[in-house]
Amino acid sequence: MGLATALRPRDSRAVPRAALVQLRLAKEDFAFAAAHFTLFPDAAAERLHGHNYRVRVELSGAELDALGFLVPVAPVKARVRAICATLDERILIPEKSRLLELRQEPDAVQVSLGGRAYRFPKSEVSLLPLPNVTIEALAQYVWGELAPSLAASPVRRLRVEVEETSGQSAAFEADLTS
């Protein structure tokens, strides 16, 4: 008997049709250190400050391959690390904010809010397609960056959690199928 045969369930009725296998990945290097300020409706904002963010992902699906895997994890881990690298040691600026005035120069990004003005080196800024840099928005952003790499896989549902401090995190979870 081959390995693939040995790993198959003996009776397909043993696994309910609606059952999902969940694969959770939370590696030490699923992390990024970044600065931001949160904007508030009254045109106020926090001071510029930083966090050491941590990212966790959960993949859910019903079908395992012949060796009992939901999906090869190495490419998923590599993609999460790559997403984190684009945010690491950067100033996160929400480019879709109606509260900020942004001006891009060849070598700098200028940001104004009320009486505050910043000029950052362009290489140290990540302009994010978000209205605000919150952990909720970051979780949704990371989900959106990771999801396309899973489109051809048997993963049905993806959950991304972003933690900004111990005990304070947000998650975004959605189906991968339309």
Predicted feature locations:
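Charge-rich, low-complexity N-terminal segments
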Residues: 3-178
